[in-house]
Amino acid sequence: MRCPYCGGLDTQVKDSRPSDDASAIRRRRICPDCGGRFTTFERVQLRDLTVVKRSGRRVPFDRDKLQRSIDVALRKRPVEADRVERLVSGIARQLESGGEAEVSSEAIGELVMEGLKALDDVAYVRFASVYKNFREARDFEELLGRLNGAGRPGGEPEPPDEAAPGPAAAPGEGGEAPARRARSRA
């Protein structure tokens, strides 16, 4: 494998192990020419997929592009990297094992939305707003209404929790001041 630092062709594998979900082999490599160290991943690719865009244009499926689009939706969200990797691997595996050499970008978008909905509601809304090309606040309201009504009979939103506290009273008005969360200094 070519060294990404100096272009040398004689790199050596120093460590090799399966990834956490066993869907890839992680290899730690070193270049004897420059001493550079880097990591590669080896994954099974069942077939070469072609993505059919909305315009009709055909492009090769790019797993890294799928990863990047999910990463953008999940930016600054508390989701572990291994859960994101499992989502990306699951979508790629589902597409590759689907039996079709061509897959529409809409089908990929729907799989991503389905996966993000199970992973993180905020990321789901972020992705959906771009994927569905939201133009007005009403588009968000409709999506949030469907999201809040999911899983309830008739799609009704959850009723407010009776045990949930109301707005906190201001200090000195007979209520307690809201608790402050400790900040981590990372």
Swiss-Prot record:
One function term, GO molecular function aspect: ATP binding
HAMAP family the record matches: NrdR
CC cofactor note: Binds 1 zinc ion.
Role: Negatively regulates transcription of bacterial ribonucleotide reductase nrd genes and operons by binding to NrdR-boxes.
ATP-cone domain residues: 49-139
ZnF segments: unnamed: 3-34
Biological process per Gene Ontology, one example term: negative regulation of DNA-templated transcription
Keyword Transit peptide: no
Keywords: ATP-binding, DNA-binding, Metal-binding, Nucleotide-binding, Repressor, Transcription, Transcription regulation, Zinc, Zinc-finger
Family to which the UniProt record says this protein belongs: Belongs to the NrdR family.
Keyword Hydrolase part of the UniProt annotation: no
Residue ranges of the region described as Disordered: 1-24, 146-186
A Pfam family it matches: ATP-cone
Composition-biased stretches (Basic and acidic residues): 12-24
Protein name according to UniProt: Transcriptional repressor NrdR
